[in-house]
Amino acid sequence: MAAANRGSKPRVRSIRFAAGHDAEGSQSHVHFDEKLHDSVVMVTQESDNSFLVKVGFLKILHRYEITFTLPAVRRLSKDIREAPVHSLHLKLLSVTPIPEGYSIKCEYSAHKEGVLKEEMLLACEGDIGTCVHVTVQARVMDRHHGTPMLLDGVKCVGAELEYDSEHSDWHGFD
C-alpha cells in the first residue's frame, strides 16, 4: 500500500536563478565563463612522432577550417608537406613555421555523426623516412541538435546540401 501512495504524489522541483538573471531568457541558452581554458583546439603529443588534435563539436555536413600549432619536432625540416596517403575528409591547406613550432591549417569535412578521427601524415621534402602522424578528433552532431560553439581555431567555411531535403532538384517518379 505504501508503494501505491508513493506513485500518486506528484513530485515538484523548482529551479532557482541567481539574482540579476532573467528567468525567461535563461531557459534556452547556456552561458559559459569567458575565462574557460578549454575553448581552444587541444594538441597532445602521444608519442615521439604522433599528435592528437581535439577540435570539439562540429555539425554534420559542414566544412571547417581548422588552425592549430604543432610543437617543434626535431625530425622535421622547414619544408614539410602532406604525404601522398591522405584522407578524403581532411585536407592540408598550409604549414607555416613559427617560433613555437608549426602553424597547421587544414580543412575538415564532417561527413557522419559520432566521434570521428581522421589522420594526416606530414613528411619532410628531403627525407622520405621522416614523418609525423597527426590525428584530428571531432565530435560531430546531427543537424537537429543545434549549432555547436566552435573552439578558437575552428571556423565554419561552408555547408553541404542534403540529398533528401527540399533543396534537391529531383522531383521523384512521375
UniProtKB/Swiss-Prot annotation:
<protein>
    <recommendedName>
        <fullName>Adipose-secreted signaling protein</fullName>
    </recommendedName>
</protein>
<dbReference type="InterPro" id="IPR026794">
    <property type="entry name" value="ADISSP"/>
</dbReference>
<dbReference type="GO" id="GO:0010739">
    <property type="term" value="P:positive regulation of protein kinase A signaling"/>
</dbReference>
<feature type="modified residue" description="N-acetylalanine">
    <location>
        <position position="2"/>
    </location>
</feature>
<comment type="function">
    <text>Adipocyte-secreted protein (adipokine) that acts as a key regulator for white adipose tissue (WAT) thermogenesis and glucose homeostasis at least in part through activation of protein kinase A (PKA).</text>
</comment>
<dbReference type="GO" id="GO:1990845">
    <property type="term" value="P:adaptive thermogenesis"/>
</dbReference>
<dbReference type="GO" id="GO:0005615">
    <property type="term" value="C:extracellular space"/>
</dbReference>
<dbReference type="GO" id="GO:1901224">
    <property type="term" value="P:positive regulation of non-canonical NF-kappaB signal transduction"/>
</dbReference>
<comment type="similarity">
    <text>Belongs to the ADISSP family.</text>
</comment>
<dbReference type="GO" id="GO:0008157">
    <property type="term" value="F:protein phosphatase 1 binding"/>
</dbReference>
<keyword id="KW-0964">Secreted</keyword>
<dbReference type="Pfam" id="PF15006">
    <property type="entry name" value="DUF4517"/>
</dbReference>
<dbReference type="GO" id="GO:0030511">
    <property type="term" value="P:positive regulation of transforming growth factor beta receptor signaling pathway"/>
</dbReference>
<keyword id="KW-0007">Acetylation</keyword>
<feature type="modified residue" description="Phosphothreonine">
    <location>
        <position position="147"/>
    </location>
</feature>
<dbReference type="GO" id="GO:0042593">
    <property type="term" value="P:glucose homeostasis"/>
</dbReference>
<keyword id="KW-0597">Phosphoprotein</keyword>
